[in-house]
Design a protein with these regions (language model features):
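A general recognition-element feature
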Residues: 1-166
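Assembly-interface segments of oligomeric complexes
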Residues: 169-186
Length: 186
């Protein structure tokens, strides 16, 4: 059984959280004939710094030396997505390759404009995911008119088109405001 924890910020008590999740999963299997292992992975999408928090439970608590061997030490399996190498990204064969590439490039350049020409198989899911993980609602806004979106270049074009349209609208509003104020002054 796998658990996936998506993080955009470093969580200093992640091993304790994982211990709770895994404990609940094992408890849920208590009455089953066979208990299967529970593996929790933390997918960290932070682009400003690497994961700096403890990755095991014993790093969070003070355990007297004489009790150390009796205390379980839950480990946080943290994967720093924005820090993957090109070789690691190349191993992905699903849409996740597009996601990983996006965050690596966002880390390298905060003003990164998506330029990945890889075809997106699950457009809804990718755009919703990017919206949530980046806090940028424009990705989800593209969903209302996703026709013709097949790769990240299309997404970038839609973002640019929306930005241009908003700029034109704002320019029209400011122009109208200026005309009204000139007319009122006469």
């Amino acid at each position: 059984m796998y658990g996936i924890e998506n993080q955009t910020k470093v969580e200093k008590r992640m091993p304790a959280r994982i211990s709770g999740y895994e404990g609940a999963s094992y408890r849920g299997q208590y009455d089953k004939k066979t208990i299967v292992p529970v593996i929790t992975m933390v997918l960290y999408y932070g682009t400003d710094r690497k994961w700096t928090a403890p990755k095991n439970l014993k790093s969070l608590i003070k355990v007297p030396d004489n009790l150390d061997k009796y205390v379980n030490d839950t480990k946080a399996n943290v994967f720093e997505i924005a820090w993957l190498t090109d070789e690691q990204i190349a191993k992905f064969t699903s849409d996740y390759k597009i996601v990983a590439n996006f965050f690596v490039n966002k880390r390298k350049n905060k003003d990164y404009i998506p330029d990945d020409k890889t075809t997106i198989k699950h457009v809804d899911e990718i755009l919703k995911f990017l919206s949530v993980m980046t806090g940028d609602s424009r990705y989800e806004e593209i969903l209302s008119d996703k026709e013709g979106v097949s790769n990240m270049c299309d997404v970038a074009q839609r973002l640019e088109d929306r930005g241009i349209e908003k700029g034109l609208q704002k320019g029209r509003e400011e122009g109208n405001q200026m005309i009204y104020s000139l007319v009122e002054d006469e």
